[in-house]
A protein has these predicted regions:
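A short, histidine- and acid-enriched strand-loop-helix "catalytic/donor-clamping" loop
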Residues: 84, 98-116, 128-131, 162
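A short, well-ordered alpha-helix in the C-terminal region of glycosyltransferases
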Residues: 179, 314, 321, 328-342
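Conserved donor-binding/catalytic core segment of Leloir-type glycosyltransferases
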Residues: 183-199, 205-209
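Nucleotide-activated donor-binding/catalytic signature segment of Leloir-type glycosyltransferases, i.e.
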Residues: 227-247, 255
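Conserved acidic donor-binding segment of nucleotide-sugar-dependent glycosyltransferases
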Residues: 240, 299-301, 305-312, 321-327
Length: 370
């Protein structure tokens, strides 16, 4: 029987991972299609994603179907998402005595009435999972505290497509991008992502009004704060762009900003924008509440510039500093490229390999002892 990997959508940056898992383990990807709050509009067409997937994938129709997964699959991998989907996947694995693996992205306890009421259940899932696959070292530390041990936790380094983001971008491509999007001449600062409070959009716009160096803030993405971006002097909103164009935007930018802030329900799990920018040699400015910072990819003054969240003055100062210091930008670009080179899909898949092997072994021991 195949292995079930439960997720919400087929994000394009997960395709190389899911393809490897299908080839190695006969994994089938089951999509429940929820969690729209954290999913960009430009890849919410789940039916199209499933139709185009180069690996076995189908819809998962709610908790009731999830409860029966143990009848059809040898093991179940599920994320910390989807409301009742996670406990249903865990219950199914235990009911049918299958290995259960948690794909963990949370690294700070969410604060809400719902999370408070369900905390005993989530604590049980953390502790009883046969193995945990963590987004990074920061998530591993959080999960280890919940489990009381770091045994059985495997870090799967977050990866993006090198053929898109690490490729050489020509000056002609940059010139064409500028002309196509009517960008003024001069330095550019780049933001890529959803335009929502937790991504620090309001902080970024406040900071931009304080930046002293003449430059253009180029914003790629959409969301409820799009109008605020459009009305900010010196900011140009491009909306959503094809992923194939993003490398040119990163190559154009003197720096890429990732100003995420914590909220009661959200702490940036990773921010793959950091990987994308570093692959292209665009120095990153990120806050301490970005997973790529807490997880060790973006290291202050080594592979990027790190600031406190929610501090527009600090963000403006960091932007001015990078715009004024070409040598610093060059040093961070070289170090960033070297650091992100180890964040590959093969390394990510190996973590799943190890986790599946350990989970299968543990479940086998538990069966023999019961």
């Amino acid at each position: 029987m195949p292995i079930a990997l439960v997720t919400n959508y087929l994000a394009p940056y997960r395709t190389p991972l899911f393809t490897r898992l299908a080839e190695r383990h006969g994994t089938e990807i089951l999509c429940f299609g929820a969690g729209d709050r954290y999913i960009p509009e430009w890849f919410r067409d789940l039916d199209r994603q499933l139709e185009d997937a180069p690996f076995p994938a189908r819809r998962l129709h709610g908790p009731r179907e999830t409860l029966g997964l143990g009848r059809r699959y040898d093991a179940i991998i599920a994320p910390f998402a989807g409301g009742a989907i996670l406990p249903a996947a865990y219950a199914s694995a235990r009911l049918y005595r299958r290995p259960f693996l948690l794909w963990a992205s949370v690294w700070a306890q969410p604060r809400s009435l719902t999370h408070a009421l369900t905390r005993p259940l989530t604590r049980q899932i953390y502790r009883d999972a046969d193995a945990v696959i963590a987004y990074g070292e920061h998530v591993k530390r959080f999960v280890a505290r919940a489990r009381g041990t770091d045994d059985g936790i495997f870090v799967a380094p977050q990866a993006v497509e090198p053929e898109l983001f690490a490729r050489a971008v020509s000056g002609a491509e940059i010139d064409a991008f500028r002309a196509r999007h009517q960008l003024p001449p001069g330095p550019c600062v780049l933001y890529v992502g959803r335009l929502v409070p937790e991504k620090g959009t309001a902080v970024l716009l406040d900071a931009w009004r304080r930046v002293r160096t003449p430059a253009t803030l180029v914003v790629i993405g959409g969301g409820p704060l799009a109008d605020a971006v459009s009305s900010t002097p010196g900011a140009v909103l491009l909306g959503a762009l094809p992923r194939a164009e993003l490398a040119v935007a990163y190559a154009l930018a003197e720096t890429t900003v990732v100003p995420s802030i914590p909220t009661p329900r959200f702490r940036e799990p990773w921010a793959l924008v950091c990987n994308e920018a570093m692959d292209q040699g665009s120095p990153v400015i990120a806050t301490t509440t970005v997973g790529a910072v807490a997880g060790g990819l973006v290291r202050s003054e080594e592979t990027g510039v790190v600031i406190a969240p929610g501090d527009p003055a600090a963000l403006a100062a960091a932007v001015d500093r990078l715009l004024a210091d070409a040598a610093l930008r060059a040093r961070l670009a070289v170090a960033g490229r070297a650091a992100v080179a180890g964040y590959t899909y093969d390394a990510m898949a190996r973590a799943f390999d190890l986790a599946l092997a350990v989970a299968t072994q543990r479940r086998g021991r538990n069966r023999r002892s019961s």
